[in-house]
Amino acid sequence: MDAVTVMKQEVGKVAAALVQSNSVVGLGTGSTTAYAIQYIGERLAAGELENIVGIPTSFQAEVLAKQYKIPLSSLDAVDHIDVAIDGADEVDPQKNLIKGGGAAHTREKVVDALANKFVVVVDSGKLVDRLGSTFLLPVEVIPMAITPVMRQLEALGGKPELRMGVKKAGPVVTDEGNLVVDLKFAGIDDPATLEQKINNIPGVLENGLFVGVADVILVGEIIDGQPRVREIQ
């Protein structure tokens, strides 16, 4: 097993250890979060946890949770979320995030913002000085508005591109039935303002900027060939 995979597993274990019995847990999307879901399921099976309920942020998270026999519910049936565990594509020094590489950022933002504690799990390669430095900013758009929205996104200084499917002809379609526009910036100096400007465009459902939402960042690192987990509060 390669070092990066081991590192992601270690981060997943640390995140899963934060879950307590009798709690509602937001289950995020992505390769590192998948290990957290696995270890939550293993803690349940071993009797270390009991009476927890998961709120999945995507179809992928739902399938994984069912695989590991984590009981699931929906936001209609719960009045709070104790902790949410989710990944990120970029993290800046202020703990602001870009998410949405898996095209699930709208549902993720709803669940993560509702959580009393939002724990982000990443590898050290996701840490950046400025958001938008390496990763495109995803924007979920209703299909009929795609052309005017792309024009307005370009007017904000970004280079928009409709995300196309892999191993599928045509564009990526989100779990909500919408399209994703990936927006390239040279760097984002004011993520809070940009988040609001994009969301104010008619036809935009949500974008992948998560500003002031994360409580704890768990960073997986390889030091002297060994995986380590560092916590950023």
Curated annotation (Swiss-Prot):
The GO terms describing molecular function are: ribose-5-phosphate isomerase activity
Gene Ontology biological-process entries: D-ribose metabolic process; pentose-phosphate shunt, non-oxidative branch
- Binding sites annotated in the UniProt record for substrate: 29-32, 86-89, 99-102, 126
This protein's record includes keyword Ion transport:
no
Its protein name is Ribose-5-phosphate isomerase A
Q: What is its EC number?
A: 5.3.1.6
Q: Which organism is it from?
A: Picosynechococcus sp. (strain ATCC 27264 / PCC 7002 / PR-6) (Agmenellum quadruplicatum)
Q: Which UniProt keywords apply?
A: Isomerase
Pfam entry (one): Rib_5-P_isom_A
Q: Pathway, according to UniProt? A: Carbohydrate degradation; pentose phosphate pathway; D-ribose 5-phosphate from D-ribulose 5-phosphate (non-oxidative stage): step 1/1
Give the active-site positions: 108
Name the domain of life this protein comes from: Bacteria
Q: What is stated as this protein's family in its record?
A: Belongs to the ribose 5-phosphate isomerase family.
Q: Name one GO cellular component term.
A: cytosol
Relate the assembly described in the record.
Answer: Homodimer.
Catalyses: aldehydo-D-ribose 5-phosphate = D-ribulose 5-phosphate
Residues annotated as transmembrane = none
Please give the function described in this protein's UniProt entry: Catalyzes the reversible conversion of ribose-5-phosphate to ribulose 5-phosphate.
